[in-house]
């Protein structure tokens, strides 16, 4: 179940839909997001604005999620995974690897993301599979 929650986040990301992100994320002032190379974002308004910016500047994005580890603590689910990414920005196709930590909190029987931290992988090796 916890891995399914993580997968829903990447489905929302892949769809480039802010409406889907609205449903995945908590909307409190204490949630946190750190995109690779960005400053710390705190609170849903700042985080939502970051997703709008990313989606407006991305033509398409595909993920192959590997090396997933999940820990469950009562009402918290912590996932760590490798995002194998193929994205199109403008006319350029970019492949990259991002190590991510995603934390979800169960509230009123629904799991919501409260933390996302992505870090670029040095010396990333592209997997030998198509991400499309």
PLM regions and their residue ranges:
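A beta-strand edge to alpha-helix "cap/lid" segment located at domain peripheries
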Residues: 1-23, 30-132
